Amino acid sequence: MMCQGFTVVNSHVFDLPFNSILIVILFSDVDDGSTVTDFLPAERARGITIQSAAITFHWPPPPPDRNSAASLLAQASSQPSHTINLIDTPGHADFTFEVLRSLRILDGAVCILDGVAGVEAQTEKVWHQAANYRIPKIIYVNKLDRDGAAFGRTVKEIASRLHTWPAVCQIPWWEGGNGRFIGVGDVVALQGLRWTERDGKTVKAVSMDELATTTDQRFADEIRKARVALVELLSEYDDQMVEKYLECDEDHLAIQPWNIIESLRRCLLNSFSPLVPVYAGASFKNIGVQPLLDAVINILPSPREADDPEISIGTVNGGLKDLIHGKMSPEAPVCSPVKSKKAVVPARKSKTAIIGNLEACALAFKVVNDPRRGVLVYVRVYSGTINRNATLFNTNLQTSEKAPRLLRMYASDGIDIPAIPAGQIGVILGLKHTRTGDTLVSYIGSNPKTGPPAPLNTLQLRPIEVPPPVFFASIEPHSLSEEKPVADALALLLREDPSLRCSVDEESGQTLLSGMGELHLEIARDRLLQDFKAKASMGRVEIGYRECLLSPSSIETAMFERETAGRKGKAGCAASSAPFAGDEEALAAVATDTEYSSHQDGNRVKVSVVGSTGLAEETESSGSPLPPYLPLNAVYTALANGAFAALARGPRHSYAMYGTNVSVTLDPALHVFGNETTSGALSSAARLATQAALRNAAAQGGTAVMEPLMNVIISVEEASLGPVVHDISSARGGHISSLDDADVIEASMHGGKTREDQPFIDLRKVYAPPDPFAASLVVGGEDPGMPGSGNRQRSITAKVPLKEMVGYLKHLRSLTGGRGTFVMSVDRYERMGGQREKALLRELSGV
């Protein structure tokens, strides 16, 4: 509860007794490494959340004593105990996929803000990701007990940076107005809540009359002011609140607390309402945590009230609830006349029966390799119940697996359970093939091999989107014998974290591991070496440079003559090489009827046979200059393959060639020697002739080094635009292609909305209580949260050498205060500048 992440929850009424796990989570401390959900050694060592962790508890618990916070709140609400499935997610930008896969399966979210830092860069990013999934959210401003905490400023930043109207439901209670943080003012219930002990076990409810007469008159006045602002804001988006306001003779303070709670709930359930409840507290001292949990129960939706899960079945998209209730046809409608009603009714009943036998539907959102238990698959059940030993059909992989054991998780600990019902999160042990994002269904009477009948065997819940990687490093096994163990360990690591990607560079032979950032890969390396015991090291990425010719060569002739396995092979050919523009138009140039042309990796090879009239003669044996056992097509392919093999290694620096045109000529009278000339011999002759032509061209005009040029799209705030553009164009040798408003990028970040579609937030109308020493928060008379401070998003499109983009993410975050992001892809190869080429060659020679 006290991490600086984006905590996401789902809840539903479940009448079970409370157990002691709640006390552990409330009184753990991220600062000393005792947080229950931060159980990895790296998390405890660094004091941050690295991977999402699930924990299930009940709220409200049985009151331990009459004066406790839980007792006071339980007496006020008299509500049954609820089951809360809480997932603690990381706050660091490198672990954004952990947030994404958690957001995908939750019903509500609690956004925890640092009261000192305010709305940070990663907060904005995750907020928009949650909006993309239309998840109801509440905000908890934490760490108000620290020096420099400013609740009012944070509320203003919520409005300006998150583009939402903050509905302030609590205000901080500062002792004496400017002293230490001692409690909160409950704007909904019109009372003060003061935590009287340092550990937060005891809370005292102070009425408005007592506040006004004996304790703090200014604080009581501020609570009334906050109540007026809250009712006015709710009236803008909830007609029923307007009716209650009129029923109470337009008295904001006369409206009952439950009426305000119901109004807040209605606004949150409306995904188009730009309103978010805001609460205050200090988790280190346990101040405000219990009212926050009450808000989770009272305001956030239960699984029954959440949006219908998106599914695809066959070619049809829709909602899972609509499918189960018969409101969605599992097949696309066929526009054909119905000839007989009797022929239609049985088919309709058959479809209904098929859907009725669907026992459960769940989404696997996380896979973890536990050293003691094996592979743990975290699932969210959307429909029905998954029972122990049930046969689950994976509709993505079209395979069936047994679920021999089910667990309810408490961070790293698990308790065996007989079933996972709808709306719950659980863990399945024993699944060998299931991956993150796979849909699992249980069907009554299904065939274990073929699964449920069509079209239910194609039922898939909305998948989890994996962001593209932006940071790369190489993985090198310590020896050849360690290659397979390292590959197996990487496969386990990638199954756990799909945001990691593994690939093999065909030119360098390096195994490349890519991820979301430097810290992400650092943690992956530690897990690979320490948890999976892989014997490998992580190094830097080697850039795949290319070599190009600067002048054409003369025609070079080569003869190949060698005896292999007792059979003599002999052939010859002539070849010449020349530079050419390796663009699409040049590569797409069509050969004539008498020559063969092929292009590969930016190079082109043309093959001609003296005396040949083209492939058409292959059907006419007469008149061909080649012997019958050498088809013209086979000769073309063999010669081209030999030339391309020679182009894989340049004459000067051994880089692969790029932008090279090779012409290979075969004269059957000079280069074919009866049965000794085979396809293999021709290929070897073409390789030797091409290598000779490349050496000749290099001797006459030299070669140049080419480097991969990346197409980079950078999203930054306008205030950071100048430094980023200057860095790209000067320090990194890039070329700026365009500077645009980031409407397209914002549309993807804001759930399909551009900035013009976002609600206009007039900060003058946003209520925020005064902060202690508020004058020091405004510098030069400008509110940092006000519009016009340079927080408009801009998009930079540039062409930058790949070498300069290695490790760029960390530098970009430094330039933009953590608010810059980028994506890149290979655009083309470009010749290196003189100074850069000299530096590279010095590096290669070890000077």
At which residue positions do the language-model features occur?
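Conserved structural-core and active-site-/substrate-pathway-adjacent residues in large, well-folded domains
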Residues: M1, G47, D88, S102, ...
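Gly-rich Lys/Arg/Thr-decorated short loops/hinges at beta-loop-alpha junctions or inter-strand turns
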Residues: S77-I84, L103-V110, Y237-Y245, E465-P477
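Short, surface-exposed connector motifs at secondary-structure boundaries
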Residues: T83, D107-A109, Y133-Y140, F272-P277, ...
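A conserved hydrophobic secondary-structure block that centers on an alpha-helix together
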Residues: T89, A109-Q122, C502-S503
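P-loop NTPase catalytic nucleotide-binding module
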Residues: A117-L358, A362
